[in-house]
Each structure stands twice: as C-alpha cells, then as structure tokens.
From Swiss-Prot:
UniProt gene name: dnaK
Pfam families linked to this entry: HSP70
Protein name: Chaperone protein DnaK
Function description: Acts as a chaperone.
Keywords for this protein: ATP-binding, Chaperone, Nucleotide-binding, Phosphoprotein, Stress response
Domain of life: Bacteria
Biological source species: Acidithiobacillus ferrooxidans (Thiobacillus ferrooxidans)
SUPFAM superfamilies, sorted: Actin-like ATPase domain
Amino acid sequence: AKVIGIDLGTTNSXVAVMEG
C-alpha cells in the first residue's frame, strides 16, 4: 500500500510516507 499524508496505521501515528 502507498500512503502519503496522515497515516494512523504506523508506529509514528502521524504524517508519514509509506511504500510497501
């Protein structure tokens, strides 16, 4: 999944950019 912006599904629970 590609998430650019607010991502509450990460350990950072903040603005993050994930790819994979």
